[in-house]
Amino acid sequence: LRTDLAFQNLADFLPLTSAQCTGFRNFSCAYNSFGVHPGLSGIQQLYNNGNLAFMANIGTLVEPIANEQEFDSGLKKLPLGIYSHSDQIMQWQTSVPQSRDAVGFGGRMADLLHAANTYQEISMNISLAGKNVFQQGQNVTEYAVRNNINANNVGFTPVPSWWSNSGLINDLRLSTVDSLVSENYSNLLQKTYSTTSQSSIAAFEVFKEALKRVPSFSTVFPTSSLGQDLGAIARLLSIRNELGAKRQIFFVTLGGWDMHDDLVGGLSRGLPNVSQAMKAFYDATVELGIADKVTTFTISDFARTITSNGMGSDHAWGGNTMVMGGAVNGGRIFGAFPRMSVTSNPMNISFRGNFIPAVSTDEFYAELALWYGVSPHDLCYVLPNLSNFYTYNVSNPPVGFMNFTGTSISNDDLPQTCLTY
């Protein structure tokens, strides 16, 4: 995103010119002109159609920090490793930035809501990116699949039929596995592995049958890794009833954004992939008739400095994110877009242009959690720091980017006392 202010004093900055930007039709922020990179034409279309919103200057926070003076005072709790990739990736997934927690936001929601699904062997958290913190709960973990998942490749890969005695060999393999996982182990690690294996075997049998019913799509997904990941999610959404799924959380990743150099070329290559894949995924949810039941959002580790290092941009803090779906109050920019200046700017904490977040991940996630069906009573379990930023009221949502029409939440359903740790 760039505002008109970003085009002033260009010598040290990294903007596109206003002529290069792809503009938006309306705004809800103080500035009068916003636009996106020309490679984000699909994102622009989604925004202008009211199906996508931006969240400006969001980041990990333990408690609100009003300005640079409070940041420097030493009186405010700060996230661990603000400029560390590994720390901030973890903290965006947990929303507990004062500790290196192994339980994520999506995992805690699944702890509460997984029981609503019919087949308990199949986790409501499905990952296209393997093991991750975001989907790890106290009781629920992710079920990892590949983006080429279909009825013929889920579960064990059989010995090819042209092998001699292939049928016998496959039967022996399955019976051996059954024997191993059904053994009553006393060793805790063996017992845990056996239980996990049993659950996985039961899950892929249900998956195998359900995947036979995936319909043909008219929506064409890009061949990029993100496009194929989101295409796989669309196929899994199409068999949600066969899987007995009333709630699901999917997780994908896309790297390559640490652009200390080649920033212009890197964005020109990477952003169209994001735009095309997200547009195709939204179109697929429309095709399935579930656009208002699926919300897609992006998370990262941190933003980048607004001034150049000569070749690119370096680690910063508050940044921007996107939310997409039929239930999103789209065509708007939420949060507080910072003044694009490194001087006389109370939210800037570096001569390079590094902004204190105006919106916390807790507020962002609280809005998503309430829309998803988490009771206000349970918000403190899902987001332990939330009371530092927000007190629940049905007429005052955490941020405002979700449409809660049709929800049954009321002021009588008040949250428990939040315990910050």
Name every feature range the model reports, one short phrase each:
Residues L1-Q276, A280-E287, T307, R332-Y421:
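Feature for exported/extracytoplasmic and membrane-associated proteins, marking the mature portion
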Residues R247-I249, A291, I299, A316-G319:
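Active-site lining segments that contact anionic ligands and/or coordinate catalytic metals
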Residues M278, T285-G310:
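Metal-dependent active-site segment of extracytoplasmic phospho-/sulfohydrolases and closely related
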Residues S300-R332:
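Histidine-centered active-site microenvironments of extracellular/periplasmic hydrolases
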